[in-house]
């Protein structure tokens, strides 16, 4: 009997741990505990650890309300962990629960997903379906920053500025970022004083100190504060010689040297710009480099650089052609000079340059013409009619008189004089001589009536 009782007790003792273990396991994997564990981990932002518990809970087929909450935490965790299927999961959740109280946040998460993928129009559409003011403070600020950036990326700068301004006033976290983008927007809008005001405090900020000096220097150059532009550019190049903005800083430095009349330094700076900028260089930089070469008497380089400027019909092109012509004259390439002057004279962008170019064009024609009485006379006539009060008018008149008297083409000379609206005293004196010569020729040819007319006009 005692033996039997002992066996029963032994059996009970052996089975007790198994029963206790089963009860503990059931307690741990019960739907309530799985939900509680998953939710706690989710609230602690331990998303990777929350997912297994929440997935296990969903498999238990819980009540509809708890299932909706659990699946919300699962898709939110997928977003936070940058799951490659996060957009699909978020949209599927909205399809399953169109009336979910979490819809506002889900839309904001979807918008954020599209923002990070660079799909700014899609992101904006979803942000417009979201009430950002209903989100938590930190998330509200994050989404507001994304919304403002989306507007900027889609060129709606007015809306972008409104949202950046709003965020800057309420979020210390994004204050400097907002200041930078507001300054950038003002810069693109050519509101340079406002832009400069926001750029300047960011010069020592670790995130922006290698970026904002470019805009600061550029604004100083635009406002013709070349001394300040020079200082900013020099300091930047000393600190960041290989930065992506170094090329532009060399350009700005060249701009400053050019306007200081320090042409050798300008050539060096602009050369640094061209050596580092492998995209299409700016026309104004090529123009200033070309004129710097001209001022330093490197005429071949001047013509080469200025030739790259003449892509648009404007004042820059007109002056580039003029100085190309002047450079070619120094290189004794008169035909190239003539063609360049002709192009400059054809433009009315700047009448003073047009006048100088027209004079040089006529002079080149005169010096290169194979015909003694040809295109040069026509060019001189045109010049005197267009610029009768020009300081070059006397020289042009003298050239014409020289041609009239040396070629002995008196009838052609007379017609030429008659085409000049306001002939100078020199030309009128030449006209008298020409009429006398025509009169004597007619008399010698026994054309006495014609001779009398010419001689009477010559008196």
Question: What kind of region is each of these model predictions?
Answer:
Residues 10-17:
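Bacterial N-terminal signal peptides
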Residues 2-5, 20-459:
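Acidic, polar-rich low-complexity tracts and alpha-helical solenoid repeat scaffolds
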């Amino acid at each position: 009997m005692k033996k039997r009782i002992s066996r029963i007790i032994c059996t009970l003792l052996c089975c007790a741990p198994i029963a206790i273990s089963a009860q503990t396991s059931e307690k741990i994997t019960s739907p309530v505990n799985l939900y509680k564990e998953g939710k706690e981990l989710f609230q602690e932002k331990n998303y990777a650890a929350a997912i297994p518990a929440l997935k296990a809970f969903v498999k238990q087929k819980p009540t509809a309300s708890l299932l909706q909450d659990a699946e919300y935490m699962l898709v939110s965790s997928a977003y936070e962990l940058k799951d490659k299927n996060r957009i699909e999961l978020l949209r599927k959740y909205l399809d399953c629960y169109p009336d979910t109280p979490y819809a506002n946040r889900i839309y904001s998460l979807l918008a954020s997903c599209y923002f990070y993928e660079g799909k700014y129009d899609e992101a904006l559409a979803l942000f417009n379906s979201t009430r950002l003011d209903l989100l938590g403070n930190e998330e509200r600020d994050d989404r507001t920053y994304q919304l403002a950036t989306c507007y900027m990326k889609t060129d709606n700068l007015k809306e972008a500025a409104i949202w950046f301004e709003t965020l800057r006033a309420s979020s210390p976290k994004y204050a400097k970022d907002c200041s930078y983008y507001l300054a950038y927007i003002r810069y693109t809008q050519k509101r340079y004083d406002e832009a400069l005001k926001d750029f300047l405090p960011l010069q020592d900020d670790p995130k922006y100190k290698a970026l904002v000096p470019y805009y600061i220097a550029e604004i100083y150059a635009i406002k013709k504060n070349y001394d300040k532009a020079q200082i900013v550019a020099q300091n930047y190049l000393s600190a960041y010689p290989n930065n992506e903005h170094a090329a532009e800083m060399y350009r700005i430095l060249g701009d400053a040297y050019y306007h200081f009349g320090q042409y050798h330094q300008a050539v060096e700076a602009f050369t640094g710009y061209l050596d580092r900028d492998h995209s299409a260089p700016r026309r104004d930089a090529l123009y200033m480099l070309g004129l710097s070469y001209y001022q330093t008497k490197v005429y071949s380089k001047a013509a080469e650089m200025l030739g790259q400027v003449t892509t648009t019909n404007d004042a820059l092109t007109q002056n580039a052609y003029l100085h190309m012509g002047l450079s070619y004259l120094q290189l004794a390439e008169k035909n190239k000079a003539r063609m360049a002057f002709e192009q400059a004279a054809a433009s009315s962008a700047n009448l003073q340059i047009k006048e100088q170019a027209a004079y040089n064009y006529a002079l080149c024609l005169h010096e290169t013409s194979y015909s003694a009485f040809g295109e040069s006379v026509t060019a001189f006539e045109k010049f005197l009619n267009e610029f009768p009060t020009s300081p070059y008018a006397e020289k042009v008149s003298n050239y014409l008189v020289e041609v009239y008297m040396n070629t002995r083409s008196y009838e052609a000379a007379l017609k030429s004089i008659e085409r000049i609206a306001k002939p100078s005293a020199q030309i009128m004196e030449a006209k008298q001589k020409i009429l006398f010569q025509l009169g004597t020729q007619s008399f010698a040819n026994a054309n006495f009536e014609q001779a009398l007319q010419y001689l009477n006009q010559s008196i």
